[in-house]
């Protein structure tokens, strides 16, 4: 870790992350910034979503056009926490915004993007809507970060979106073992 890096997490938080593979942390993010993100991203959702908000929608890489998203992606406290957790400086490279929770099935983000060396990809999720256990929280399986990285090829599936649901089913079976 670099000498000028600051510890923002306790030793017990780091140990919990190493054991479970995820960490819930409060970085006291600026609420005005978060509200501005919601407001400024809203018009970027596709027209079909604007007409029917029950349809799934997302905006990828809003950090390229919205200052507040870029500010969040580069938040120093989050970057310092990531450095404590993985022992390397982080490089934010993608943002995904959703108007509401995505209702995704069990999956591994490494099928979408990865890192070299492997096992250094970390995702940061910031809820921009109020959530609780009844309305769509993010679900992690404790310890799943210690599993093998599975690609579609590992399940004899041809790569591509047409096999994504089958991939999710295979990942769910691995998790349930």
Which residues make up each language-model segment?
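A structural signal for well-ordered alpha-helical scaffolds and beta->alpha junctions
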Residues: 10, 75, 79, 121, ...
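Short, structured patches in soluble enzyme cores that scaffold and shape functional sites
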Residues: 108-110, 126-130, 142
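Short beta-strand segments in beta-sandwich/barrel cores
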Residues: 23, 130, 138
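Non-heme Fe(II)-dependent double-stranded beta-helix
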Residues: 1-20, 24-117, 153
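Residues in well-ordered beta-strands of folded domains
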Residues: 93-99, 125, 139-141
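Generic structural motif
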Residues: 32, 44, 129-131, 143
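Short, conserved beta-strand element in jelly-roll/cupin
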Residues: 116-133
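Double-stranded beta-helix
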Residues: 134-177
């Amino acid at each position: 870790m670099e000498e000028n890096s600051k510890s923002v997490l306790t030793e017990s938080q780091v140990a919990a992350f190493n054991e479970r593979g995820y960490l819930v942390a409060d970085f006291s993010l600026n609420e005005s910034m978060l509200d501005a993100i919601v407001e400024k991203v809203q018009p970027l959702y596709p027209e079909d979503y604007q007409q029917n908000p029950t349809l799934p929608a997302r905006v990828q890489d809003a950090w390229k056009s919205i200052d507040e998203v870029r500010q969040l992606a580069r938040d120093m406290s989050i970057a310092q926490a990531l450095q404590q957790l993985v022992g390397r400086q982080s490089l934010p490279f993608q943002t995904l915004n959703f108007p509401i929770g995505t209702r995704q099935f069990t999956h591994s983000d490494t099928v979408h993007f990865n890192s070299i060396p492997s096992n250094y990809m970390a995702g940061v999720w910031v809820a921009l809507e109020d959530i609780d256990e009844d309305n769509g929280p993010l679900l992690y399986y404790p310890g799943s970060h210690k599993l093998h990285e599975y690609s579609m090829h590992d399940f004899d599936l041809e790569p591509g979106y047409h096999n994504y649901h089958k991939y999710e089913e295979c990942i769910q079976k691995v998790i349930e073992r």
